[in-house]
């Protein structure tokens, strides 16, 4: 490709890298998937994301569910008050980071997404449900009455969540457990969003928590991440 306006040019791989803010390997995987081709891999080293496609789909649907509750749930006003008044966040920055609302109640997400046994099992494996100790095979929502922060991998796939309580409830922050697609020590919250602004990050600022990353981004500091 070649742009006569700015002089940018390259091949299909470099175009996908620039357009989608991906590295070389990620661009190869995207192009291979679009062409229905398989990327050769070392024997014995299958891609953990391909193995867990159903789980990733449910985590993405969970993020969408929480975002919808922030807009339409009868108790969404307190979430808006916390985000806008207490934290000073705009609706736009909340949208950029995909913030949501987990309503009060023990089975809201379960009822919305987990009607089938196999889906419940995937939600359990993804850390979204907790099994009742006194009733094996019965589950409840892990995240209840919290502001929800989806945790994305560098390609933008939702792999986990953090949930912030409104008051003094303990724990103040509740995070997803480690799963097949989420190892906390290997992820940086906000890295995907930072790459959308600057595909090649010369340096990053490491801050304490989710809200620090979001507040800095709202004020133009878009290269911060949290561990």
Predicted features, each with a name:
Residues 4-10, 56-60, 71-75, 86-88, ...:
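Short acidic alpha-helix initiation/capping motifs at coil-to-helix transition points
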């Amino acid at each position: 490709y070649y742009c006569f306006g700015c002089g940018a040019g390259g091949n299909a791989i470099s175009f996908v890298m620039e357009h989608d803010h991906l590295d070389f390997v990620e661009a190869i995987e995207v192009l291979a998937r679009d062409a229905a081709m398989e990327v050769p891999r070392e024997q014995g080293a299958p891609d953990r994301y391909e193995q867990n496609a159903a789980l990733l789909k449910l985590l993405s649907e969970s993020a969408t569910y929480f975002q919808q509750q922030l807009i339409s749930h009868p108790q969404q006003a307190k979430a808006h008050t916390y985000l806008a008044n207490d934290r000073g966040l705009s609706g736009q920055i909340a949208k950029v980071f995909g913030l949501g609302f987990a309503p009060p109640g023990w089975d809201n997400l379960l009822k919305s997404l987990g009607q089938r046994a196999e889906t419940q099992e995937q939600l359990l494996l993804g850390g979204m449900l907790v099994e009742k100790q006194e009733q094996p095979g019965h589950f409840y929502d892990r995240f209840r009455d919290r502001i929800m922060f989806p945790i994305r991998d560098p390609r933008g796939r939702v792999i986990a969540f953090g949930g912030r309580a409104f008051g003094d409830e303990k724990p103040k922050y509740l995070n997803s457990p480690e799963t097949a697609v989420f190892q906390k020590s290997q992820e940086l919250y906000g890295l995907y969003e930072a790459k959308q602004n600057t595909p090649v990050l010369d340096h990053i600022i490491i801050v304490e928590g989710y809200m620090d990353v979001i507040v800095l981004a709202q004020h133009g500091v878009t290269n911060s991440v949290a561990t």
